Amino acid sequence: MPSPTTRHLVLTFGFAVAALPAVAADGKAVYDKTCVACHASGVANAPKLGDKAAWAPRVATGKDALFGAVVKGKGAMPPKAGAADLKDDDIMAAIDYMLTAAK
């Protein structure tokens, strides 16, 4: 039988874990669900995933500028890529995934 101290630690740890914010979605999962339709083929001038030359000028603007472009929309891309329920953490995860592929 666990000691009262052990039970207290387990309960405390359990509450601490439950209080953590939800982990942002995997960037690839967000890309596959929301971004792939345009960024896989380059539709409407969208830079293709992994195309270093196409991504270079966007990389130069920085992640904050890319985030703003996704949130507000840019060119043919609607705000939040048409996924109004997309969370900021998910957007950043997708940006990180696409930038990593462009290196």
Language-model regions: role of each:
Residues 1-11:
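Bacterial N-terminal signal peptides that target proteins for export
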Residues 35-41, 94:
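The canonical Cys-X-X-Cys-His
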Residues 4, 41-56:
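His/Cys-centered metal/cofactor-coordination and adjacent catalytic loops
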Residues 47-48, 56, 68-93, 98-102:
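Axial heme c-ligation environment in periplasmic c-type cytochrome domains
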Residues 18-25:
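Sec/Tat signal peptide C-region and signal peptidase I cleavage site
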Residues 11-12, 22:
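Cleavable N-terminal signal peptides
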Residues 25-34:
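Local sequence-structure signature of Cys/Sec-based thiol-disulfide redox active-site neighborhoods
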